[in-house]
A protein has these predicted regions:
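Active-site mouth loops of central-metabolism enzymes
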Residues: 27-40, 99-114, 139
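Short, acidic/polar
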Residues: 35-49, 108-124, 167-175
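Active-site groove signature of glycoside hydrolases
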Residues: 121-140
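Beta/alpha (TIM)-barrel catalytic core signal, keyed to glycine-rich beta->alpha loops juxtaposed to Asp/Glu
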Residues: 137-240
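Generic structural signal for well-ordered alpha-helices
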Residues: 5, 46, 69, 73, ...
Length: 240
């Protein structure tokens, strides 16, 4: 199947207008999990999406405390190199080792970003990451300029091809842009949550920054399968 393509901002990366989000593939057992998942079913879903023309997968180090990246890595390892999709992942969320259900600390220090990228490369089984994103703004006192400078160094070193942010405000985007161009922005956006459409998305359009929204189906609420019965049957560790 031939899907429509778009260039991701000025990065030169061409992506399909539909991608594969692997938050749920991380499974349960952590603060924002989707309950128990079948890894083999997740891999089959990835393979089905790629065979249908999707050319990128989005994941994050925090999803399942690294498990989502491992599942994506398994899926990639079973594909011929020429058929593998682009890989996008995120950093900057530090889980509590004593309590996996405690919301992770939003931490984007240069040292932690460096640790996270190496872990992600290993779990994904890739030599570089096509798009590396700061998941949330730092809450530990690290200036965003320091975080963004480290992201730029990862590009210069060839560990990542493009860099982006998720959940950033216009003010933070402006500060990043003064250090190095923001290749991509990933805000929440759906028929229910439209706030980004009047704030950060116009900023991105004006600055040549690509936009990949997350939760466009509002975590399942906008699908025709999200019934009262399904909600009642959800696992206790499904954050929804």
């Amino acid at each position: 199947m031939k899907l429509n393509m778009r260039r991701l901002g000025t990065s030169g990366i061409e992506i399909t207008t539909v991608g594969f989000g692997s938050w749920a593939a991380g499974g349960g057992g952590w603060a924002f999990g989707w309950g128990p998942q079948d890894d083999d079913a997740s891999i089959r879903a990835i393979e089905r999406a790629v065979s249908g023309g999707v050319n990128w997968i989005d994941t994050a180090a925090i999803y399942g405390l690294g498990h989502s990246e491992e599942v994506v890595g398994r899926a990639l390892s079973g594909m011929p190199a020429a058929d593998r999709p682009l890989v996008f992942t995120k950093c900057g969320m530090d889980p509590d080792p004593a309590d996996s259900y405690r919301p992770p600390t939003r931490k984007a220090s240069p040292a932690f970003i460096r640790i996270e990228v190496e872990r992600s490369l290993r779990r994904l089984g890739v030599e570089w990451i096509d798009l590396y994103q700061i998941h949330w703004p730092d809450e530990t006192g690290v200036p965003v300029e320091d975080s963004w400078g480290e992201m730029g160094r990862l590009v210069d070193e060839g560990k990542v091809r493009a860099i982006g942010v998720s959940n950033f405000s216009v003010e933070l985007l402006e500060r990043c842009e003064r250090v190095r161009h923001v290749d991509s922005l990933q805000p929440p956006f759906s028929l229910i949550h439209r706030g980004s459409g009047s704030t950060v998305i116009p900023w991105a359009a004006a600055h040549g920054t690509g936009v990949i929204v997350y939760s466009p189906m509002a975590s399942g609420i906008l699908t025709d399968s999200f019934s009262r019965e399904r909600v009642e049957a959800m696992a206790e560790d499904d954050w929804r």
